[in-house]
Amino acid sequence: ISITGSNGKTTTKDMIYAVLSSKYKVLKTQGNFNNDIGMPLTIFNLDNSYQMAVLEMGMSGFGEIDRLARIARPKVGVITNIGLSHIEKLGSQENILKAKMEILNYFEDDCIAILNGDDRLLLSIKKEKLPFRLEYVGTTPNADIVAENIVIKGEEGIAYDMHMGDTSYNISL
């Protein structure tokens, strides 16, 4: 699982790790070592004892996430949001979107992209044009997976209702 976005990468990585490591042996990127040195160092620690890896991918320009994705070959890609970080180098949020979308460059038909359904630029990605599965997650009806009734419990975690089509779950993390 690889994660990128303008904000929230490390928190998202740590939350995914917390959930998965309750059942699986999972390797994760330490801290925010998410560049072309730090992420490959994490992968060097990946051996057969691990069932999964959760990798953070950062960038400041075009081609950087592509290099990381070529190394990691994720089966699941998460994009948290498209903000203004690195706009001075990339020129526009649309270009930031293009750079972040590089995380999906090596996806095959068995891969899943999970995008923030509350982000207008990410919502511009059309599902029917992709050779892999795309799911939007958010708090609005635009999302495929919707979180409602969110309660932040401080150090105790977070609770919310999750809706996927006609199915609902009470989630507590």
Identify what each model region corresponds to.
Residues I1-G117, L121-L130, M164:
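Phosphate-binding loop of NTP-binding sites
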Residues Q93-E94, K127, P131-L173:
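Adenine nucleotide phosphate-binding catalytic loops in nucleotide-utilizing enzymes
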